[in-house]
Design a protein with these regions (language model features):
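Active-site gating/metal-coordination segments in enzymes
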Residues: 34-35, 47-135, 261
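Catalytic pocket-lining loop regions of alpha/beta-barrel enzymes
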Residues: 91-95, 108-216
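Acidic-and-aromatic substrate-binding clefts and catalytic sites of carbohydrate-active enzymes
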Residues: 12-19, 43-50, 74-80, 103-110, ...
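Mid-to-C-terminal alpha-helical segments outside catalytic/metal-binding sites
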Residues: 1-8, 17-35, 85, 209-216, ...
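Conserved, mostly hydrophobic/aromatic
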Residues: 5, 28, 56, 60, ...
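Histidine-centered divalent metal-coordination motifs
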Residues: 5-11, 129, 168
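Alpha-helical scaffolding within the catalytic cores
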Residues: 19-26, 51-58, 80-83, 149-152, ...
Length: 261
């Protein structure tokens, strides 16, 4: 099983458990998760996100067989070109996570498109978390809303050569991303961390709308517990073959991992 939506490090507004490399691997073992894509939780609120990437690179060094590092960078922070090259060439990071609401830009900003195209040229995947934490849990100093899904769709259209993961989102089936159309390329996949199975069965809808090959397993740990994501797979009315694709096979292909992982 491969989790495409996990984190390491501290977060400015709440304590996170199991947030070290060793601690997260032990936590993954409890739930039968073999590998996880991780990025810096601290970099979400750092003025210079590269400091968080350096911390993650150090944490995953002893766990590269289990943890797949992604960078957190801001397209509007000076010097991102150098930081992106370091993350790719020196840290071996497979992708980048973008947090426009936290880093004060929009996905439609031309600088964001330039960043995405540069990362795509390096073969890196672009992950866009729609939410970091429930707004009801946010501290009194901040008010960060969920990312607008139509804004994500506009970036997907503008960068057809990039590979995207839309993470920790809900309502996707009813958005432009779910409805699709001739003008939206099939260059994005969706993780299951916040989509429903029982109420409205958004997961089933997404399988029908996007296809079973574009649904990925994700938990959001340690911001969220892994249990609900596992329960969704158990409850999903789909064949064992489809569930196995969601558990790991789709992530292997989407992330460009060796076929035996």
């Amino acid at each position: 099983m491969i989790d495409v939506s996990a984190y390491l490090g501290h977060f400015a507004y709440r304590q996170l458990r199991h947030n070290t490399g060793a601690g997260l691997v032990q936590y993954m073992d409890r739930f039968g998760i073999q590998r996880a894509v991780v990025s810096s939780a601290a970099a979400i609120t750092y003025r210079n996100p590269q400091a968080g990437n350096e911390e993650v690179a150090a944490e995953v060094a002893a766990h590269r067989s289990r943890l797949i590092p992604f960078a957190v960078l801001s397209p509007v922070y000076a010097g991102w070109q150098d930081d992106l090259k370091i993350c790719h060439d020196q840290f071996g990071m497979k992708g980048v996570r973008l947090y426009p609401k936290w880093h004060n830009y929009t996905l439609t900003d031309p600088r964001c498109r330039a960043f995405v195209n540069a990362a795509a040229d390096m073969g890196m995947v672009i992950s866009i978390p729609v939410r970091v934490e429930d707004p009801r849990q946010q501290g009194w100093l901040i008010d960060v809303p969920d990312l607008n899904l139509d804004e994500v769709a506009r970036l997907v259209r503008a960068c057809p050569k990039a590979r995207f993961i839309v993470a920790n989102g809900s309502g996707i089936a009813g958005s432009a991303l779910g409805r699709g159309g001739k003008d939206i390329p099939g260059n994005y996949a969706v993780d299951i961390s916040r989509v429903s199975v029982e109420f409205g069965n958004e997961l089933g809808q997404l399988i029908s709308l996007l296809g079973e090959d574009r649904i990925l397993f994700g938990t959001g740990m340690p911001f969220q517990y892994p249990g609900p994501a596992l329960a969704k797979l158990d409850m999903l009315e789909a064949s064992a073959a489809v569930k196995e694709k969601i558990r790991s096979q789709n992530a292997v292909r989407w992330l460009g991992l060796p076929a035996d992982q």
